[in-house]
């Protein structure tokens, strides 16, 4: 069963990555832009497959965050270079075509464009319990959003 789910996620990446890459990365200052690209129940009862692109202008970053508690995530770098760190692991820079995964409940402490001059984009594929959400919840500091 797990192999079928992994295969479905990889097929989604293969299908969605070229379409997501065809759209230019939005340039809106230093904020990452998240664009939903896929949301479909699976043939596994109670599970859904969702995908988003995350576009980073040069030097942009995402706030530290958590994802939906049930979500297993596979990320694929479409363009540029993405610096990522999940709590407890060393930070790493991923380049075009590279992937990483995040286990359910992981705390994503770093997610940013590794370049100050070039945009970057990733595709994140979520396998999660149907109805679980939101997909991403940013951390807060003293009840204020991270900046």
Go through each PLM region and give its residues:
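Short, solvent-exposed loop/turn elements at domain surfaces
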Residues: 62-65, 85, 133-136
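Glycine- and acidic-residue-biased ligand/ion/polar-headgroup-sensing regions
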Residues: 70-88, 98
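Extracellular/periplasmic catalytic domains that process cell-envelope and extracellular macromolecules
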Residues: 43-47, 68, 76, 93, ...
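Ligand-binding loop in jelly-roll beta-barrel domains
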Residues: 83, 90-91, 104-133
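Conserved hydrophobic/aromatic beta-strand scaffold that supports enzyme active sites
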Residues: 51-53, 74, 99-101, 124
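A short, N-terminal "cap"/entry segment at the start of jelly-roll beta-barrel domains
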Residues: 2-7, 14-50, 91-93, 100, ...
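Conserved short histidine dyad/triad with adjacent acidic residue
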Residues: 50-68, 90-91, 103-107
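Short, flexible surface segments
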Residues: 58, 79, 96-97, 104
């Amino acid at each position: 069963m797990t192999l079928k789910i992994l295969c479905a996620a990889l097929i989604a990446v293969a299908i969605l990555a070229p379409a997501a890459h065809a759209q230019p990365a939005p340039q809106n200052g230093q904020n990452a832009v998240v664009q939903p690209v896929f949301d479909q129940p699976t043939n596994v009862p109670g599970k859904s497959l969702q995908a988003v692109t995350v576009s980073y202008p040069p030097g942009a970053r995402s706030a530290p965050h958590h994802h939906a508690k049930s979500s297993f995530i596979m990320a694929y770098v479409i363009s540029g270079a993405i610096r990522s760190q999940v709590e407890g692991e060393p930070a790493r820079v991923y380049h075009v075509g590279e992937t990483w995964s995040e286990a359910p409940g992981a705390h994503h402490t770093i997610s940013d464009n590794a370049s100050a001059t070039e945009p970057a984009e990733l595709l994140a594929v979520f396998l999660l319990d149907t109805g679980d959400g939101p997909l991403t919840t940013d951390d807060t500091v003293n009840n204020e959003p991270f900046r």
